Amino acid sequence: MRTIYLILTFVCCIIAKAETFPYRSIASFNISPASESHCMILDSEGMMWVGTNSGLKSYDGYTVKSYKSNALSPGILPNNDIRSMAEDHEQNLWLGTRNGLVKINRKTGVFKTYFLPSEDQRIIYHLFVSRDGTLWVGTDGGLSYFNPENESFYTYTSRNAWRIDENGKKQRLNSFSVKCVTEDKNGDLLIGTWSSGLMRLKRGSNVFRSYPKLNDMNSAYSLFFDRNHRLWVGTWGYGVLCISNPDNQKNPQYHQYPYATNNFDIFYKFVEDPTTNTLWACTREGICYLDEDQPQAGWSKYTQIGGNPLIYCNDISTDGAGNIWLCTQNDGVLQITTPPSLFRMPLPSTT
C-alpha cells in the first residue's frame, strides 16, 4: 500500500453547509425541558456522565440512570446543580456543585460531600486532575487542591502566595475567580480566570506568574494544549486566541481569531480529534472546528441541527476514536462521528 494525499473538492461544501453535519441524537438520554445540561465527561471505563441543574445522569450505551437528592434519596448531593466533573486516578468521580464537592467511589457506590471553608468557595466552577493525581478546584475564592491524606483543602491566598505581573512586579496574590486549569508538558499549571488573565504556577511553587493581557476584560475562560503544544484560550466575550509559544511568558505570541459580539465570542471548551487532526470547540452559538495543520485558515462553524438553531453547547468530549459528544442545553446529548481525514485519502498501490 502507498498513501496518496489528495485535497478533496467537497471539503468546501461541507464547511459551507454547517447545518448538514452528521450527528446522532441519543433518544434514551433526553433531558427534560425544565433541566439544563451543564457538563459532561467520558470516564476511563467508557461511561458517560452528564451534570445538570437537577442532578447527575449516567449512560453506559444502554441504560440511563439518575442521581439526585430528593425525598427518596436525601443527602446524596449537597446541591443538585452540578457545574463541573473530573475522574481521578483511582477512578473516583468528582462533582462540583453550587454548594460543595462530591466524591463518588465507583467501587462502593458511596457518595461523600466536602465543603471548602470560605463562602466564595461554595460554587465549584472547575475540577482538574493533574498527571500526579492531584485534584485541583477552581472557585471564586481562587485555586485550591485536595489533600487525600487528611481530606482537607489547601487554597492559595494573599497569606501564602505571590503573584508576578507582566511587568515583573512581585506582590501578594490578590483574589481571583478560577474558570479553568490545565497542565503543560513540564507539569506546570496554567490557570484561566474570569477577569484576572492567564497565569502559570510551577509545581512546588507559591508564585503565580501572569501572562500579558489577553483582551479588554482579561478573560481566560477555557484552556487547551493541542498536540503541537500550542495553548488555545477561549474567552468570555472575546472569541478565541492561540498562544503559539506559551513557554515564553515575555513573548508568548498571541494570535486572535476574528469574532463578533454574540457571534462565537464565548468559548466553553476545546477537544482534539486525532482521527482528523482537528480541534473542536463548543460555544454559546454552536460548535466549530479547525484544521490543526492549517490554523491560519480559521474556524468552520456549525450553527444549526435539523433546521433548528444549535445553541448553548455547554460541553464537549471525545473518545479519541473519531466520536465527538456534545452536551447541549436544548437538544440533549448529540454524537458526531468524524469521518477519516477530510484531507487525506489512502489509495491502493498500483505497483
Residue ranges and their predicted role:
Residues 1-351:
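Carboxylate-rich, polar loop motifs that coordinate divalent cations or form catalytic acidic clusters
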